[in-house]
């Protein structure tokens, strides 16, 4: 009995230490969040420039696999500041997604494929509806995901929604074991985002994400936020417009 209790205590201690270490890696100051968003923006521009300008550079494509997971993690952390996802913020996100769609098409993407802002908007809307525990809203959430699936071929599809949902839940989880399970899910979902493309893309996405998170967690803890609130969606639309013009 004593041995069993000792083993249980050791296991609990290991879980606690692991959880503390993971929180030091995954919980960032406002300045660190902006650093991660900046890295993600650079990776996104490299990826889009490579595709839109037909540069055909493998390293640019592989580096770009880290952009979406980084944005998703920051998004999940930002949402955790509020008890519930605010519908006003979701509406603003829908607006930016609709505005950016023209520039997405202008840059050379199929008109019927939704841009990545739609993935964030769909995920936020689905999560909000599911939180209400209303039958018709749950049905609406399922319908929205079903409709989004065929339109999300260039925006990570259902795997992208899963990545966003796990990121959202990770920063709201209060139980240590739940957080560890969610981190394990992240380590599986991040490669899954690009597994259909190639094994190299799947590995690159995970490596770029882990490397960025590891480096940023060691610096910038006292740095204040330096990007305005709507900088990302504004930059997203503008960079598509610029790349579209360059591709003419």
Curated annotation (Swiss-Prot):
Keywords: Cell membrane, Membrane, Plasmid, Transmembrane, Transmembrane helix. It is a multi-pass membrane protein. It is found in: Cell membrane. It comes from the Bacteria. The chain crosses the membrane at residues 39-55, 180-196, 200-216, 232-248. Its main location: membrane. The keyword Nucleotide-binding does not apply. GO terms for cellular component: plasma membrane. InterPro entries: TraX, TraX_Ftype. The keyword Membrane applies. Belongs to the TraX family. Responsible for the N-terminal acetylation of F pilin. This is Protein TraX. It comes from Escherichia coli (strain K12).
